[in-house]
C-alpha cells in the first residue's frame, strides 16, 4: 500500500460518515465569516429557529465593505447594511469577532493566522473563495457558498466529495527580484486558470521550503485562480516558529507540534497529477489581460491573439500583441489585499520607494491587511516612508482588490495591483488591472510604468 499525502491524512481525520467517491460528511474545525456572505445564512438560522451549533469554532471579521480612510463613514446603503447586520448577528449568536474598528480588525485571511486560529491539521471553511490561503499552514481550507455557511452554522459539518490530488513542486533558487507572487502567477500563466479544477493542490519543493509563512500564504491564496479551491503545504519548523506565542494556539504547544509533525506527506504518497517548475528560470510576472492566466514575464512581449477571449481582453485593456509590460501607462498603484498586504510585503515595497517620489499624475495607495500589521509597520516607520514618497497610507481592509467599497480605480485607468484577480471591472467599472508582486508595484509607482526590479540595487 502506498503512503498518504497530508491531504489524505487530514481528510481521513475529519470524515464522519460516507464512502470515498461519494459525498462524505466532514467535521469543520474552524469557520470564518465576514459581512458579505453571512447575512442570509444567519437569517436562515433565524427562520428555522436554530442556533449556531459551535459559536466557539466560529469567528467573524469585517473586511470587504469597510472604508480605508474614514472607516465609519460607510455611504453605500448595501455595504452599511451588511456591516451593521454582521455586528448584530455576532452579538445575537454569541460569536467572537474582530469588530469594525477594533485592534484586531482586518481581512479574514490575515486575522485567522495572526490570532493563531489557523493551525495545521484543521478543516477550515469560509464564505470566501480565497480561503485556501490557510492551507499554507497544513490545513484543509476552502471557500463555501452561503447555503453551506448556513449548514456549517447549524451542524458544524459539511458534505463534500474528496477531490483528486495534484502535486506542484517548485524547485531551484530564484534570481533576486523574484518572489512567491511570481511563482504562482507563472504557474497560472503556463497551465491556465482551469488546471486545478477538481484537485487539491499540494505545493512543495526546495523553493517552498525557503519561503516564510507570509510568502507561502501568497501562493496558497491564489490556488483558486489556478482552478483549485484547495491549496495545501506541509507544516515545518517555519510554520511552528510563526505560530508560537499567538493568542489562540494550543496551550500545550509542544504537544501540538508533535502531532502536527505526523501530518506531513509520506515519501511514497501518490498523486493524480504532478507539475514541476524551476523557479531559477522565472522573471518578474505581470498580467496583461482579464484573467490571471493572461500574464507574461517582464522579458516577454504580449502574445498574439489566440482566441476570442484574447481579442476581448486586448480590447478591454487597450493593449495589443507585441507590447511589453514596460509600455503600460499606469495611473494607479495598489499595494494590499489578502494576497500581499502582510508586513513583509510592505517592508519590501518600502525598501524600493525609500527616499524617492512617486511619478507625477499617479495615485498610489498602501493598505495594510490588518490593524496589527498597520501598527507593526508604523512602529518601524514604514508609514512615513510611504507618505514621504507620495503614497496614501490607509486603514486596513480589502480595499481596492474589489469594487465593493469606496476604493476604486477610475474608468479606463491602468492599475498595478498586488491583489489576485484582474477580471473586467474587478477594481471598479472600466478599471484595467495588472497583477504583480509588491516589488513590481512599488517600482512602478516611482517610474510610472513597470520596470525590471532585478536591476534595482534595493531589491535583494
UniProtKB/Swiss-Prot annotation:
GO molecular function, one term: 4 iron, 4 sulfur cluster binding
GO aspect biological process, one term: L-leucine biosynthetic process
Cofactor: [4Fe-4S] cluster
Residues binding [4Fe-4S] cluster: 338, 398, 401
Pfam families associated with the record: Aconitase (PF00330)
Enzyme Commission number(s): 4.2.1.33
Key word Repeat present: no
Keyword line: 4Fe-4S, Amino-acid biosynthesis, Branched-chain amino acid biosynthesis, Iron, Iron-sulfur, Leucine biosynthesis, Lyase, Metal-binding
Catalysed reactions listed for this entry: (2R,3S)-3-isopropylmalate = (2S)-2-isopropylmalate
Pathway(s) per entry: Amino-acid biosynthesis; L-leucine biosynthesis; L-leucine from 3-methyl-2-oxobutanoate: step 2/4
Transmembrane annotation, as ranges: none
PROSITE patterns reported for this sequence: ACONITASE_1 (PS00450), ACONITASE_2 (PS01244)
Cofactor details (free text): Binds 1 [4Fe-4S] cluster per subunit.
InterPro entries per UniProt: 3-IsopropMal_deHydase_lsu (IPR004430), Acnase/IPM_dHydase_lsu_aba_1/3 (IPR015931), Acoase/IPM_deHydtase_lsu_aba (IPR001030), Aconitase_4Fe-4S_BS (IPR018136), Aconitase_4Fe-4S_dom (IPR036008), IPM_dehydratase_rel_enz (IPR050067), IPMI_cat (IPR033941)
Superkingdom of the organism of origin: Bacteria
Keyword Lyase attached: yes
Family: Belongs to the aconitase/IPM isomerase family. LeuC type 1 subfamily.
Function noted in UniProt: Catalyzes the isomerization between 2-isopropylmalate and 3-isopropylmalate, via the formation of 2-isopropylmaleate.
Assembly with partners or alone: Heterodimer of LeuC and LeuD.
Name of the protein in question: 3-isopropylmalate dehydratase large subunit
Native source species: Streptococcus thermophilus (strain ATCC BAA-491 / LMD-9)
Lineage: Bacteria, Bacillati, Bacillota, Bacilli, Lactobacillales
Amino acid at each position: 500500500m502506498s503512503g498518504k499525502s497530508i491531504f489524505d491524512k487530514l481528510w481521513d481525520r475529519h470524515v464522519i460518515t460516507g464512502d470515498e467517491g461519494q459525498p462524505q460528511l466532514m467535521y469543520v474545525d474552524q469557520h470564518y465569516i465576514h459581512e458579505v456572505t453571512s447575512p442570509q445564512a444567519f437569517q436562515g438560522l433565524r427562520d428555522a429557529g436554530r442556533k449556531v451549533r459551535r459559536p466557539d469554532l466560529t469567528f467573524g471579521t469585517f473586511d470587504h465593505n469597510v472604508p480605508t480612510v474614514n472607516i465609519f463613514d460607510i455611504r453605500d446603503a448595501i455595504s452599511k447594511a451588511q456591516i451593521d447586520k454582521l455586528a448584530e448577528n455576532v452579538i445575537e449568536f454569541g460569536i467572537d469577532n474582530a469588530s469594525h474598528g477594533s485592534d484586531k480588525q482586518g481581512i479574514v485571511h490575515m486575522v485567522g493566522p495572526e490570532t493563531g486560529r489557523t493551525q495545521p491539521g484543521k478543516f477550515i471553511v469560509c464564505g470566501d473563495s480565497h480561503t485556501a490561503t490557510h492551507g499554507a499552514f497544513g490545513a484543509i481550507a476552502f471557500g463555501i457558498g452561503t447555503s453551506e455557511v448556513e449548514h456549517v452554522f447549524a451542524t458544524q459539518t459539511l458534505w463534500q466529495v474528496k477531490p483528486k490530488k495534484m502535486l506542484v513542486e517548485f524547485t531551484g533558487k530564484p534570481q533576486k527580484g523574484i518572489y512567491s507572487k511570481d511563482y504562482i502567477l507563472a504557474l497560472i500563466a503556463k497551465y491556465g486558470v482551469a488546471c486545478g479544477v477538481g484537485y487539491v493542490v499540494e505545493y512543495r519543493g526546495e523553493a517552498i521550503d525557503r519561503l516564510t509563512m507570509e510568502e507561502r500564504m501568497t501562493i496558497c491564496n491564489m490556488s483558486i485562480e489556478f482552478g483549485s479551491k484547495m491549496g495545501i503545504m506541509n507544516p515545518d519548523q517555519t510554520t511552528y516558529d510563526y505560530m508560537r506565542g499567538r493568542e489562540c494556539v494550543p496551550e500545550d504547544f509542544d504537544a501540538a507540534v508533535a502531532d502536527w509533525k505526523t501530518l506531513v506527506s509520506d515519501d511514497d504518497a501518490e498523486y493524480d497529477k504532478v507539475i514541476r517548475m524551476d523557479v531559477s528560470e522565472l522573471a518578474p510576472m505581470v498580467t496583461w489581460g482579464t484573467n490571471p492566466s493572461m500574464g507574461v514575464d517582464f522579458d516577454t512581449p504580449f502574445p498574439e491573439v489566440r482566441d476570442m477571449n484574447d481579442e476581448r481582453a486586448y480590447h478591454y485593456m487597450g493593449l495589443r500583441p507585441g507590447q511589453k509590460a514596460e509600455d503600460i501607462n499606469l495611473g494607479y498603484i495598489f499595494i494590499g489585499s489578502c494576497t500581499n498586504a502582510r508586513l513583509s510585503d510592505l517592508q519590501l515595497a518600502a525598501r524600493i520607494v525609500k527616499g524617492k517620489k512617486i511619478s507625477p499624475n499617479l495615485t498610489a495607495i498602501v493598505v495594510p491587511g490588518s490593524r496589527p500589521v498597520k501598527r507593526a509597520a508604523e512602529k518601524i516607520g514604514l508609514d512615513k516612508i510611504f507618505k514621504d514618497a507620495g503614497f496614501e497610507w490607509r486603514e486596513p481592509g480589502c480595499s481596492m482588490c474589489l469594487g465593493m467599497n469606496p476604493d476604486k480605480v477610475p474608468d479606463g485607468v491602468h492599475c498595478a495591483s498586488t491583489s489576485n484577480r484582474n477580471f473586467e471591472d474587478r477594481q471598479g467599472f472600466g478599471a484595467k488591472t495588472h497583477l504583480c508582486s509588491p516589488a513590481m508595484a512599488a517600482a512602478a509607482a516611482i517610474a510610472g510604468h513597470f520596470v525590471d526590479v532585478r536591476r534595482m540595487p534595493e531589491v535583494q
